[in-house]
Amino acid sequence: MRKIITIGESILDTVYHNHQPVSAFVGGRVSNTAAALGDLGLPVSMVSECCTDKVGDWVVDFFEKHNVDTKSIDRYTDGSTPFAAIFKEDGEQDMIVNYGEYPATRFNVIWPRIDEDDIVLFGSYYAIDQPQRERLYDLLSYAAERKAILIYLPGFQHGTQFNLTKVMPSILENFEVSNIVIDHANDINTMFPNQDSDKVYNNHIKFYGPTYLHITPGTSATIYKGVDKTEVPFSCESDNHLGWQAGFIAGVIHQLIARDIKHGDIEFMESGVWSEVVTNAFDFAANCAEGDSNAMSDEFAQAHKIG
């Protein structure tokens, strides 16, 4: 079976409400998508880095619990595993403070085997942050040469400090190497202020050629491909946005494998097929968003296993 390689930051999210601790869980769209794919019985590996501390153990245990291969997670000894403190106050916007310390040498990971038609998922600030950018992009370029399907999740967590001018070349390089780009409203507002998805696609993505899936939370997903634009409506009442997004992305990848859609097929996929892929992905999203764990139910996972 085709393999799935996920590349992203290993981070622990801790949530506080009105100054009281509420929950702690492994955060990030890439990490939670990897977990969902592992629950589906798909061969998925995580390429990342975390310290040999207790938080790092927690993160690695999370992946292993969800059947994600962790051989490509570098366990460094100098520093600490990153974690984000998310402060939720009634009537106020969430405030996020990021902690953690990486070593001087970054992304010293064991490269996973990548073959033609494998799927590589990457994104967020981890995919553009300068300390590991060069080594990470070498891996992405290798995956593209091997004719894997590359899926890019642009955007980054609220509270991340960055210089947009400095990271924009890396964002555009990621567009260029990708076959599919998936984002939501908050992503483009951060990267391209005062531009809607039409402008973002036409001004920044279309030139490079990837299919663009833009999510408007609670309303629809819009598919951009060449000159075609297709809107697929949905309704989601859950406020578990991380679970919903992870489920949706996992659903898209599941459909690419279930329908035997390969690297050479992406460019020629018709809008009708994309609409079916997205519609099915909504079911995965809804299931992962039902609880607080960001994970799909055992019953749903069993019902959607391939082969």
Regions found by a protein language model. Name each.
Residues 20-35:
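Short catalytic helix/loop segments, enriched in acidic residues and glycine
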Residues 3-5, 94, 118-119, 180, ...:
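Structural motif
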Residues 119, 124-199, 219-220:
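Conserved beta-alpha-beta core of the PfkB/ribokinase-like small-molecule kinase fold
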Residues 2, 142, 195-307:
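Conserved phosphate-binding/catalytic region of the ribokinase-like
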Residues 34-43, 88, 255-257:
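Alpha-helix C-terminal capping segments
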Residues 14-20, 42-124, 302-307:
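Conserved N-terminal subdomain of the carbohydrate kinase-like
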Residues 1-21:
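Positively charged, low-complexity intrinsically disordered leader regions
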